[in-house]
Amino acid sequence: MHLQPKDQEKLLVVVAADLARRRQARGLKLNHPEAIAIITYELLEGARDGRTVAELMSWGSTILSREDVMEGVPEMIPDVQVEATFPDGTKLVTVHDPIR
């Protein structure tokens, strides 16, 4: 299987988010990379499902809460930016303060 670099990055996000969700299901609090992976994955999938940029920007701050992550992680992530593929092209989605 030959994947372009962009597709390799997306696959890495999927694997990282899956691992993070498994750890979360075991009751573990998420660290910085795990939180980023889950938020990124959900935004990419939301775009694929046809949600708008505005919807994703709003929804992105509800994916994880402070209770889901280790202490200090919310302050380490002031925003998340994801280049997502929408039905009408690729757009940048920015979520400010994604963990509240």
From Swiss-Prot:
Enumerate the subcellular locations listed in this protein's record, separating them with semicolons.
Answer: Cytoplasm
UniProt name for this protein: Urease subunit gamma
- Gene expressing this chain: ureA
Main enzyme class: hydrolase
Q: Which Pfam families does the record associate with it?
A: Urease_gamma
Primary location class: cytoplasm
Q: What is its EC number?
A: 3.5.1.5
- Name the source organism: Kocuria rhizophila (strain ATCC 9341 / DSM 348 / NBRC 103217 / DC2201)
| Residue pairs linked by disulfide bridges in the UniProt entry | none
Please indicate if the UniProt record lists Oxidoreductase as a keyword.
Answer: no
Assembly and interactions?
Heterotrimer of UreA (gamma), UreB (beta) and UreC (alpha) subunits. Three heterotrimers associate to form the active enzyme.
Per the record, the similarity remark reads: Belongs to the urease gamma subunit family.
Biological process annotations from GO: urea catabolic process
Provide this UniProt record's keywords sorted from A to Z: Cytoplasm, Hydrolase
Transmembrane feature ranges: none
The biological pathway it contributes to is: Nitrogen metabolism; urea degradation; CO(2) and NH(3) from urea (urease route): step 1/1
Q: Which GO terms describe its cellular component?
A: cytoplasm
Which CDD domains does this one have? Urease_gamma
What Gene Ontology molecular-function terms does this entry list?
nickel cation binding; urease activity
Reactions the enzyme catalyzes: urea + 2 H2O + H(+) = hydrogencarbonate + 2 NH4(+)
